[in-house]
C-alpha cells in the first residue's frame, strides 16, 4: 500500500482512535451533504416547474398586452408623445430580498409601485377603457417578468450549488472515506503484527527460562547426588529440644 493510498501516520492505538473518529466525521459529513443536495434538488425541481408555468403564462399575457396596445392605439390614437412627456421617474421599481435554502442564499426579486399614477387622466377624451385595459395587461406582464427573472436567477444559483455539493459528496465518498478506511486497516494490521511478534517473543522467553530452569535443576540434582550440596536447615521444621536439668 503506497503513501498516496493512505494517510501517513505512525500506527498506534491513539492513531487508531483518531482514524475512527475521522471516519465517523467523514461519514456524518457525507450524510449531511446528501441531505443538503436532496433539499436543493427538491427546490430546484419546484423552481423549474414554476419557470415552465410562468413562461407559458408569460406568452399569453404578452400576446394579450400586444393586442391591447394595438386596440388602444386604434381607439385613442397615438398617445406615445403624451406618455413620454409625463415621464418623470419610474413608477414600477424592483427590490431584492434573500431566501435561504439549506445554507444557499437565493435572490428574490419583487416589484412595487412608487408614487401616483401619472397616466391616470390619460384617455378621458377617448379610449379610456382600452387604455385602462392596456395598463392592467402590461402591469401583469411586468409582474411576470420580475417573477421569471427571480426564478431563473434562483435556478442558476441552485444548479451551481447542487453541482458543488455533489462534487463534495463524491470526493468524501470515493476519496476521503476509502483513504481513511485503508489507513485504519493498515494501522490494525500493523498492531496485530506487533501483538503476534510480542506474543512470539514472550513465548520464546518463557521457553528459554524453562530450559534454563530444567538445566539448573538437573545440575543441582547431580551435585546433590555427588554430595557437593548440603541441604540447608529447615527452621520451620519441628525439632525436639533436649531437656536442660538445673541443679
From Swiss-Prot:
Q: Name one GO molecular function term.
A: proton-transporting ATPase activity, rotational mechanism
- Where found, per UniProt? Membrane; Cytoplasmic vesicle, Clathrin-coated vesicle membrane; Cytoplasm, Cytoskeleton, Microtubule organizing center, Centrosome; Cell projection, Cilium
Q: Which UniProt keywords apply?
A: Cell projection, Cilium biogenesis/degradation, Cytoplasm, Cytoplasmic vesicle, Cytoskeleton, Hydrogen ion transport, Ion transport, Membrane, Transport
Give the bilayer topology: Peripheral membrane protein
Q: In which tissues is it expressed?
A: Expressed in brain (at protein level). Present in tissues active in secretion. Amounts elevated in brain, kidney and testis.
**Keyword hit for Cytoplasm:** yes
Q: Which domain of life is it from?
A: Eukaryota
* Membrane-crossing residue ranges in chain numbering: none
**GO cellular component annotations, sorted alphabetically?**
centrosome; cilium; clathrin-coated vesicle membrane; proton-transporting V-type ATPase complex; vacuolar proton-transporting V-type ATPase, V1 domain
Q: Give the primary localization class.
A: membrane
Q: Name one GO biological process term.
A: proton transmembrane transport
Family classification: Belongs to the V-ATPase D subunit family.
In terms of PANTHER family, this protein maps to:
V-TYPE ATP SYNTHASE SUBUNIT D (PTHR11671)
Summarizing the function annotation, the protein's role is: Subunit of the V1 complex of vacuolar(H+)-ATPase (V-ATPase), a multisubunit enzyme composed of a peripheral complex (V1) that hydrolyzes ATP and a membrane integral complex (V0) that translocates protons. V-ATPase is responsible for acidifying and maintaining the pH of intracellular compartments and in some cell types, is targeted to the plasma membrane, where it is responsible for acidifying the extracellular environment. May play a role in cilium biogenesis through regulation of the transport and the localization of proteins to the cilium.
According to the record's subunit comment, the protein's assembly and interactions are: V-ATPase is a heteromultimeric enzyme made up of two complexes: the ATP-hydrolytic V1 complex and the proton translocation V0 complex. The V1 complex consists of three catalytic AB heterodimers that form a heterohexamer, three peripheral stalks each consisting of EG heterodimers, one central rotor including subunits D and F, and the regulatory subunits C and H. The proton translocation complex V0 consists of the proton transport subunit a, a ring of proteolipid subunits c9c'', rotary subunit d, subunits e and f, and the accessory subunits ATP6AP1/Ac45 and ATP6AP2/PRR. Interacts with SNX10.
Protein name, UniProt field: V-type proton ATPase subunit D
Lineage runs: Eukaryota, Metazoa, Chordata, Craniata, Vertebrata
**Gene designation:** ATP6V1D
